[in-house]
Amino acid sequence: MALGLMCQFLEPRVKRDGSVVYENVIDEKLLQLGAYKNGKYSTERILETYRYNVKEILRTIPYLVRENIKSFRLSSTIFPLYEFCGDIARGDGIIQQDLAEAGRIFREHGIRVTTHPGQFCVISSDKENVIENSIRELEYHAYLFDAMGFDRTPFYAINIHGGKGNRSEKLIETYNYLPENVKSRLTLENDEKCYNVKQLLAISERIGVPVVFDSHHYNFGVDDLPFDVAFRETLATWGSVKPLQHISNTEIGMENAAYNQKRAHSEMIRYIPPLQLEAIRGNLVDVDVEAKLKNIALLKMREDFQIAN
């Protein structure tokens, strides 16, 4: 079993008034599209940013090892503006060397690595430019995993939502067009807005893509399969690869709030569906812990639910 950490690692800092705040120790640098288009970034500045962010991956790994965290979701913005400046990353020997070293260390410590491209990655869109941009984003994540030496299997998942609803034929068409290093790692996650588990299973049956079961999204879905059926059948889509799932909760006190407030991730995990908890304890799945307090929530979840490292 692995509980997965999402992109950040928080450490406590005591303020002058004695209160405690949590700060992310992963210091990723960003670049702004507007500034780039206005010519404010030199090639040297972009390269410096890319090299720095890759070094941050290497600096993150000891924190994961310290807490015995065996699954980690990489940020999607290690190479900001990659769609415009990807050649700078791909052509730099230092970046390639550091990515290869990071991949080697992740594998040495048995840490699963995944990514989750953002909400604008929509391979079922009715706009061709959106699909083209989405494919470029997926190719970026695949390049990253290739450079780290990761196998081309969904164990190293590039996980997305289905995107625009009622467009399953377009989703399948785009999937079949994807390059092999993307397609072999791609997974689809259920949500309450566009594609529920039942719909994703129908897609998976046709193209073989694994389904990431998100129990929180499932709770807000409509016209879906019973929980036990959805849970069991999503596991079956993974074949011989260990399934990846997600867990998150509604924040305490928000149970009767507006819809979007109920959907938002809580700071900590206070409830796990019994079937999912059984699978976690039985080492049948890896589960990304989608909570605002990141590793703090992950470690507390281990303790509260008696989950072995």
Which residue ranges define each predicted feature?
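Loop-centered beta-sheet repeat module
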Residues: A157, G162-L171
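Betabetaalpha-Me/HNH-type nuclease active-site subdomain
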Residues: E189-N190, E205
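Short linear capping/connector segments at secondary-structure termini
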Residues: G118-F120, I160
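Short acidic, Gly/Ser-rich segments with clustered Asp/Glu that frequently serve as metal-coordination loops
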Residues: Y195-N196, H216-V222
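Alpha/beta catalytic barrel-like cores
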Residues: M1-R112, C121-S124, N129-S134, H141-Y143, ...
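Short, glycine/acidic-enriched loop or turn micro-motifs at the edges of active sites
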Residues: Q119, E192, H217
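Conserved, mostly hydrophobic/aromatic
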Residues: H116, D214, V287
